[in-house]
Amino acid sequence: MIKKENLDKTSAWPFVEAKKMLRERKSFIEKKGKITLQTGYGPSGLPHIGTFGEVARTSMMVNAINQLTDLPTEIITFSDDMDGLRKVPDNVPQRDLLEKNLHKPLTQVPDPFNKFDSFGEHNNEMLKNFLNSFNFKYSFKSSTFLYKSGFFNSSLQTILKNYDGIMNIILPTLGKERQ
């Protein structure tokens, strides 16, 4: 915790970035009434030091924001568990089971550990246990659950209505091979 009188002077990166975010997104933050930061997790493998680092850095930002403002904060840890299984990790049992399910969404791939309904669910639980062991404060969100619940429907409809305009913006930013 930094003393209030030193907050303006600190050059620690979480405070520099938090001040920048509060300044640049002031009207949006005031309208929303809270600040939400998000981390992402691709559950095709077990949580690792990179996963820890992303949540730790985001938690440092929240700590800085909490010292700079009284607005409520939240960290969402978002699991991209609808991603396809691209390769079989070396550190799992029943690798042949996973081989048969390459390119399927992780929540449709059987759990090689035989503990959960899917490999995605297994790794999501591993992630939550991992983060909980370090007392991180977060809200967990699964892309599978959110898509199935219709959470993204209105946004997806907006994208479809504006498809041509969106493509006119995105395509020029891509290399020829990705267009």
Where are these regions (language model features)?
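A glycine-rich helix N-cap at a beta->alpha junction
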Residues: 94-134
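Non-catalytic terminal extensions that flank enzyme cores
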Residues: 1-49, 63-77, 93-103, 129
